[in-house]
Amino acid sequence: MKKTAFLRRGTCVLLAIIMVCTLIVPALAAPAGADEGINLKIAVLSDTHYLSPDMIKDTADFRKSLNSDRKLMTEGSAINLKLLEAVREDKPDILLISGDITKDGELEGHRDMAARLQQLQKDVPGLKVYVINGNHDVRNAGAKNYNTPDGKAVKATRTQPSDFVSAYSFVYNDETVIARFVPSEGKEAGQLSYVARPCEGVTIIALDTCCYSKDNTSKGKNEHETRGAMSDELVAWATEQISAAKAKGDHVIAFSHHGFVPHFSMEPEILKIYLIEDFKKIATQFADAGLEMVFTGHMHANDIAAMTTKNGNTLYDVETGSNLTYPSPARFVQLREVGDSLVASVNTLNHVGPITYYNALTGKTETIKDLTAYGKEAGFTPEMLNTVAGTFVGNILKKFVTVETSVSDWINARIIKNIQAIVTDVVNIPITEDKNLLDVANYIYQSHLGGEDDGNYPDWVQVGLDKVKSGEVVDQLLAIVKKHAFGDVASGIKFDNIFTKAVKAAMSDYIYRIAVSMGNDTNFTDDNDALIVLSGSLKAASVAVSCDGKTMNAPAIVDNGVCTVFPTRILMRELGAAGKAVTVDASASGAETVCVWERGAKALAAADKVNFIAANGSMEFAAAGLATGGDVYTAIASAVPNDAQKRALGNQLNTAAPFVVNATVDGNAITAPCSVTLGYKPGDEGSNTLTVVSVGDKGEIASADGRYEGGVMKCTVPANTLSAVVRFPFFDVSEGAWYFGDIVYAYNNGLFSGTGDHTFEPETTMTRGMLVSVLWRLEGKPEAAASPFTDSGDSWYTKAVDWAAANGIVAGTSATTFEPNATVTREQMAAILFRYANFKKLDTSARADLTAFPDAGSVSAYATDAMSWANASGIIVGSNGKLVPQDGASRAQVAAILHRFIEKCIF
């Protein structure tokens, strides 16, 4: 169908427009690699220490067990269920559990946990579960049942290696398990190790680093030990598996119970049983073979440590804390190939709750509102220290006191005999007015457990460290020991001769170094939430995330114009962002697209709104719409309008800078409103008439509440809908009015001019001369012979009336009069448009039954056919259910009717 002259655009002009738009608003970068290559979601739990509630009873034996460590055993079953529920909600591809699944290797506990894990697999289709044993899990003589009639604990069923395999047969027999380690004849060490290949490109090696068989226990017995070790043949086998996987082009990760890299500088000296023996040698060998990351546990701490070999190969040891001790975390890791790199996003979940459980100690059902806060209260206590102090005293004597064994035994015996009084006084050594030595010890230790060991101590902790360093604390400690255990004169003299000034100084220095080592871990910057580039050329960066004037950094990567940001639950909590507006400022990255992976989007959902700032503008969304599942991509991109949108923009097409907010969640377009800010340079006309409109696929124009402020345009547009910056000079046309889009269309296409520089007078009635002038301009202002109307005169509408009369579009009110200044009625407008359509040789066959309107009888005979056609064509649809044919048509109504006429009849 022939197009009218005012809407024609040449190919050269279009190309120029597209180039200008591209320069103004850069094109959206494709989310490269988003659906290609490795993309694994992994959940990690460790040290679940499950004890069946059926084995718990409030007895002296059970309370003694509770006092021996910090585990939340009574609450444990409910805690484990809650964290498994978190895994269920996350729907990962893989769940890793890095040992100490049970309290003390109770077979009943392994079977219970296996059942829970199998149910989890049913609930999360496709989930692969891989487990490995910890030092508590196999051949543990401490396996006990505390729920007995007489209150005396009895032995529970002890788990043998074969029992472990049987309980977790669904793991060991899984189709993805491609190899198992078989020790040489007569040996058992490492026998629970295996290799799995859950997907193309990734190999996972489960390493049994525990000592429970006579060929690798220090006493040559088949009884568990806390320490970890790998036999030479297990190391060789694991190295072969790593090399074989690399030969296939796989990335290799592992998991085990014991650590491969120290998680604080003094760990090899004071807590070496939490690392495998010869850790440096073995870690180096594995890293050089191609192992990139190992997930560990054992220490009940959240920490990430890295080591790099002389050959330049780096191994990351990601240690996960226990469910049952502060901060009771779960890890959520995503492995994804981005460009040429493999990226690991490590997030920590804590502060879960509420958790309801039966408390066997009180006989009541109780609720934990916040597990992390609850666990923090379960730090070291005097009762617990009474239980473990003997070992600590022995180690201190061995390290600092050079005396005969008999003397050492004498000191040790006296201290143990009076341990309760000593511990009570020692923990209460004052540090400040309201803090004591136990407070400092708990703070330092828990900061390491929680992955918060950044050296940013509260003032009172620093005071405590200073007192340790100066020797003041050790002086008070030894004075307390002397008072309670060596009070007689002779013993006191002997004690002073042993604990000389030099010994005290060495002890102070040692304790201070331990505290600083645990409280200020400098090996890796973030132990809870980290972004690790395991291979490739990408570099980890950071992006500012802010809320209420507080700013923190979130890890990020930039690739191919896309800045992927990794906000976390911990970051959102520390910002206090719940229910508030959050800004993710990626502008410094230079990227035009901001991406957040699924878990990060769920973290952002805690906010009310999220504002993403890219290099070319910002986009603000309601946070709830970002957490529906899947990755979030947002970008302000140049847009190429379709034909209907080109007509809507009309004469402003070459200056409108069409753009679109491309926003998706899991590949699905977001259509919700989005507040946008983008850079814009006004032309010579200035900025006071600038606004923004959104233009639908069919050319529908809607206000975007656009306004120019200090070098930027601000607006609210539907995401994934073309929008444009346009000039609209009429201040009396409300952007919320029903006719706003129609008047914009008319203005953009030169159909109407205003009644003044900034007035349109939308409610003013239209004259006959105005209407004919609009059609004349629509036709391209053709010349015509003079009309017979004597009242058209020499005026702005004269040529339009001449043209309309010459072509039978108007007939006048008499043979010689046109009445150009008379108000055009709705039926006159229908008649004029009907004749114009026939002049254009458009299809005018459509008819509607006007009797449906109560005022149909008031339509003049000459206009009946035209009104029927106009109604059937959707041009005149009535007002409040009536045709009101004799009413004058307002300028706004005429704009709307002409808009419909052009789009419905001409195009």
Could you say what each language-model-derived stretch is?
Residues 30-110:
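N-terminal active-site segment of His-dependent metallophosphoesterases
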Residues 540-558, 563, 652-749:
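Proteolytic cleavage junctions
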